[in-house]
Amino acid sequence: MNMKILILGQGAREHAIVKSLIRTGTSPKDILVAPGNKGIAEEVECAPDIDITDCLAVDKLALEQGIELAIIGPEAPLVAGVSDSLRAQGVAVFGPSKVAAQLEGSKSFAKQVMSAAGVPTGMARQCKTIDEVEQAMEDFGAPFVVKADGLAAGKGVIVTDDSKAALKHAAEYIHMGILVEEFLAGQEVSLFFLSDGKSVMPLTPAQDFKRAFDNDQGPNTGGMGAYSPLPWLPENFIQQIEDTVALPTINELTNLGAPFVGLLYCGLIITDRGIRVIEFNARFGDPETQVVLQRLITPLESLLYKAATGHLENASDAQFTQDVAVTVVLASEGYPASQAPVREIKGIKKAQRVSGVEICFGSEVGRVLSVVATGKNFEKARKRAYKALSKITL
């Protein structure tokens, strides 16, 4: 298609989007990333000094650079209304409006939308005081699920049997409001849908691992690893989620006067009572994006532009390779509770020489990078990922 593309963001997710665009036919010279990071800057041009939540600064950059498609990576610019501002300048934007992005920005708003749309989800209670949190915890019982009712960089949720830890977490985020929810047990699935506000297109399912340590131990994080596809899913799973979750949600937002144009991330759990929605995100998930887009064959530029311009119904379904993709996140020590000092990463070139491996660079602290590996089966892909990781020191 050969259009000028702006990607907002600076993490491994945005690096994965860049790599997928290039892999599926976009020229690197047509991509600009703001602010980007050192790894992304090795592949495409970056505008490192931009505050991507500043609507005026982003508008100015887009107009100066002749941007035809803007892709918004993280949640903060969406909630700040950057997509609305860019659209007002005539730029096609893949990313929902400020109002529609409240699907992620406010857990209580998401619950209201799901209730109105008849989307299956867990029981929840909105709490404004610690006394209300305590009462809700008592009513629902352990394990306790306590969620910040706002953006918290993937760290706003605690699931624990320890009531003191749950209350401490609630106290930390009580200024946002708190949701206490019933605990749901089962396998979790992340399923992305492209949406143009009228129709949706599913991508391939993935599963991510949110706990900080091995064997699903430790605190929740933004995500420590993921894999795709999920061969254990029921045959009609994707169609079922499209019919019972994605389309009703999109239609309800349209009814509210806030058409959702962008990426609807459905965080799902398969319980013994059926499928339930745990959460929605209003953008590509990190680290699931790294494995989903690694397997994409269809030109990503075309898919996102059709979604951004309201023509998704004219697009053929996204196609994916049969390979398995695995990503493992390398994080600095102390993550997510504390930040280690910035240190030089060594061994990247050696890791990149491992067959079937790519590195997506994240931030200088916290989730530093994602090693993405593909293989004919899960074992082969996983082995390649850890072989590459063994060559990296932080």
Please describe what each predicted stretch is.
Residues 94-156:
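A conserved helix-loop-beta module that forms one wall/lid of the active-site cleft
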